[in-house]
Amino acid sequence: MRICFIMYPWKTVDPLYDSTLRVIHECIRRGHTVAIGTSSNLTIRGSITQAYVDVFVKQAKISNNFKVFYKTAKFKRCQLPLSGFDAIFMREDPPLNNIALNFLDSVKDDAFIINDINGLRVANNKLYTASFNDEQNSFIPVTHASKNREYLEKVLRECKHDKMILKPLNGHGGSGVIVVEKKAISSFRSLLDFYISGEKQDYVILQEYVEGAEQGDVRILMLNGVPIGAMKRIPAEGELRANVSTGGSVAKHTLTKEEKALCQFIGPKLVNDGLFFVGIDVINGKLIEV
């Protein structure tokens, strides 16, 4: 197969932790032709959607050491039509560029795009968890999204617990995630000044604090709506966020009864939305993010 990965720049890949690198490695190990590129290198020439990509040069031996594989990879620069690929993985960090998705629209009938373009659009930020209609909050923590300061302050004051989680709507990798306390309204106002003031006036998420968050979260990989693996992510000392990018560590994890029930609850909708290959972040059996 000919497989293209639309991703972040190759030079930014951390071979010790990068999940896309591992998918690429497995594709090459299985004998597929693999190309990588960024959305900024998508082009249209004569009504044909193309991309400047780097095609991996096949080598006699493929190292199973990801650091060695990364450092020894060789490429051939090409300008190729996207319709010539059998599969296209969209692996850029969210929020995805809508123009890039428009480029992919033109080849969605020629190549299998992972994930489906419409699915990528509907799940392009943290509002997607609200679409599961978990009215009893059995699987999804109570979540508020707004850029109205009065409303956000009211939510924090009326919260049943003494703290909540504040984060930007379009953040990723744990960036901007902060614990806010009910007793510290003045500090909360200062945070809102940072997040929703100025020209952009971005939306923020104010979410129920799930007990156990300080011990980390669980990243579950799902394929076709079914969990295929999981790892426990443990935050560094003094850190709330468990992301590896913020110093967190990982450990093997066996799904709990509650986590399996969560996967059964969200799996059908993920598939229906065309989200075939996803990672979900879970704390104490509750879905934090897709």
Regions of interest found by a model, annotated:
Residues S19-T20, R149-E150, R157-D162, N170-L262, ...:
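Phosphate-binding site of ATP-dependent enzymes
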Residues P94, N118-V122, R233-A236, I283-G285:
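Short glycine-enriched loops at secondary-structure junctions
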Residues K11-R29, T33-A145:
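Conserved N-proximal alpha/beta basic substrate-recognition cap immediately N-terminal to
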Residues A35, I113-N115, I165, I205-Q207, ...:
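Structural detector of well-ordered beta-strand residues that form the stable sheet scaffold
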Residues M1-C4:
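Extreme N-terminal starter segment of soluble prokaryotic enzymes
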Residues K232, P268-V290:
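Conserved metal-phosphate-binding beta-hairpin within the catalytic cores
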Residues I6, F89-E92, P168:
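Short, well-ordered coil/turn residues at beta-beta hairpins
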